[in-house]
UniProtKB/Swiss-Prot annotation:
Domain of life of the source: Bacteria
Reported phenotype of the disruption mutant: Loss of DNA conjugation when disrupted in recipient strain; strain still secretes EsxB.
Topological type in the membrane: Single-pass membrane protein
UniProt organism field: Mycolicibacterium smegmatis (strain MKD8)
Name used for this protein in its record: Uncharacterized protein D806_0077.1
Compositionally biased residues, Pro residues: 14-23, 36-45
Cellular compartments per GO CC: plasma membrane
Ranges that cross the membrane: 53-73
Species classification: Bacteria, Bacillati, Actinomycetota, Actinomycetes, Mycobacteriales
Subcellular location: Cell inner membrane
Length: 377
């Protein structure tokens, strides 16, 4: 079993690397990148061996790996567990949804009662994936599948449906609108992927990528809660203005995809992410498991140099989210911005737990990027 988080409330050093090395080829490489299996137990912590993961890069081809990464950073604190007896029910009313009255600005999440409950759900989902499916080539259409691969796709589709059904209860319980939206989008895209397996074509894979990126973002948000970096850095970030409108409250058990057609900001969003990847090349080479108190002069300079780059990136995402005209897109953008700025605020006194802030931010930005691709296909 993958190592889970064990502590909350104070910043602790993560027990070994959970982040795989980035794949090459940019955000949307035309080439196929083989998928890599994830070890069941994280290797021992080593200095210099683990590099930052720009989530958008790895998510080009990694679906199985991403789910496993989600398990690696899922909180296990039973104090945040879902109340017993709270099963999935029918169409809920506003009173059944804890975040129904959340119409304020999106901010760094310091507490969430669903963080512990997601672990068993995603662990079971990951266990349904065979090595054959993890290493599949998503560019192969259904007509090219072997009988074994066809069976594996169908098995994973069933696992996605099951996970989506279970996550629906978490969407009702979280008190945070943005967290509910992440759960809802996992549900919507996981089911869409499963629905399309009988008629699978290569673009169908983007639906799975959105689902697992949403799950991955949730897990990093919960990791920041569990290791205390969210609580430590959230007070350092000023909230943006409250939105003028939020997405209509629907049934979290039957959510719709937030992008079913290309959004006008999608092209620029992708360009901004590509530019950010290029501009942070040196920073991505640094070891996230070294605290600022132990940085060399070179490491300190690299981190100081990345601050204005990250601030510019955050401002660009904020403006694009606002210009999207899509309340859910805007919330995802704003949440990415808040976690990015929290990371920036952490740099002068950086500890390894702060890496979860940066990883949550890039996963959120990547989620919107892949959703744009899925909508265009």
């Amino acid at each position: 079993m993958l190592a889970g988080l064990r502590r909350r409330g104070s910043m602790t050093t993560p027990p070994g690397p959970e982040i795989p090395p980035p794949h090459q080829g940019g955000f949307y490489s035309a080439g196929h990148h083989p998928q890599r299996p994830w070890p069941e137990t994280p290797p021992p912590k080593t200095r210099g061996g683990v590099k930052w993961m720009l989530g958008a890069v790895a998510l080009l081809a990694v679906v199985g790996v991403t789910v496993a990464v989600t398990l690696a950073v899922t909180g296990k604190d039973k104090r945040d567990a879902i109340p017993p007896g709270s099963g999935v029910s029918g169409s809920p009313t506003a009173s059944d949804i804890a975040s129904a009255d959340d119409s304020g600005p999106v901010s760094v999440i310091t507490e969430d009662p669903t963080c512990a409950a997601q672990g068993p759900i995603l662990e079971t989902f990951a266990a349904q994936q065979s090595q054959l499916w993890v290493e599949r080539d998503p560019a192969l259409g259904r007509e090219s599948w072997s009988p074994e691969l066809r069976a594996d796709y169908e098995k994973v589709g069933k696992a996605m449906r099951t996970a989506a059904d279970q996550v629906a209860q978490l969407a009702k319980i979280t008190p945070h609108r943005a967290m509910r939206e992440l759960y809802e989008q996992f549900i919507a895209y996981a089911r869409a992927y499963a629905d399309n397996i009988p008629n699978y074509t290569p673009p169908t894979d983007n639906l799975a990528r959105v689902a697992v990126t949403a799950a991955d973002a949730i897990s990093y948000i919960c990791a920041a809660v569990s290791y205390g970096s969210a609580a430590a850095r959230a007070p350092l970030v000023e909230n943006r203005p409250a939105p003028t409108n939020v997405a209509p409250l629907g049934n979290p058990s039957e959510p719709e995809r937030f992008l079913t057609a290309p959004n006008p900001v999608c092209g620029e969003w992708s360009s901004v992410l590509n530019a950010f990847q290029t501009d942070t090349t040196e920073w991505l080479k640094t070891d996230p498991d070294i605290s600022s108190s132990q940085w060399s002069i070179e490491q300190k300079q690299i981190n100081e140099n990345v601050i204005p780059i990250m601030k510019r990136f955050a401002n660009q995402l904020y403006l694009l989210g606002k210009d999207s005209g899509n309340p859910t897109f805007r919330d995802i953008a704003d949440l990415s911005v808040q976690y990015r700025l929290a990371y920036v605020a952490a740099i002068p006194t950086y500890t390894p737990a702060d890496k979860y802030l940066a990883n949550a931010s890039i996963r959120l930005a990547t989620m919107a990027n892949v959703a744009c691709r899925a909508a265009a296909d």
